[in-house]
């Protein structure tokens, strides 16, 4: 189905800076709305229920799975993550632009359902920098960091499945790149015809 709104799906290996980039984009672009995922993992730091994630018990997550409430869900780093079907469909059906942070498995699954979804993959500039960022975050044991790096190799091998790739070396440049992708999507013929329907009619453009 062709929805009037845009769905931007951002994925990255842990530590690449995905969440920081999406947060910065939304501070610059009030027209784009976040799609908050559900997860069984515990909150980190200052994360709040309903802002970064909806934090669920395994039983609550199971209930949503049984109700087919998720557009997709997957196991990631020992926890489960899911995307609400209703929340996404309602927003883009009403012409809203939605951005979703998700793992690479979920991104590819969503593309199968929403063929017009724009998939964006965030890469670190090097393995050394990725390791350094995970260590500076101070949230994981050395064993968990090694597991995340191992998973990152698998995830980054899937980058070819995405529409756009951003290398997050200089943060300000990466934010600019992300904003540029969003803006370019809004300038596509189909998007402009919907957004400026009166102008298109006046110019007799079918």
Curated annotation (Swiss-Prot):
E.C. numbers: 2.7.4.8
Coiled coil: none
Segments forming domain Guanylate kinase-like: 5-183
UniProt-annotated location(s): Cytoplasm
CDD domains documented for this protein: GMPK
Recorded GO CC terms: cytosol
Cited function: Essential for recycling GMP and indirectly, cGMP.
Similarity comment: family membership: Belongs to the guanylate kinase family.
Name of this chain's protein: Guanylate kinase
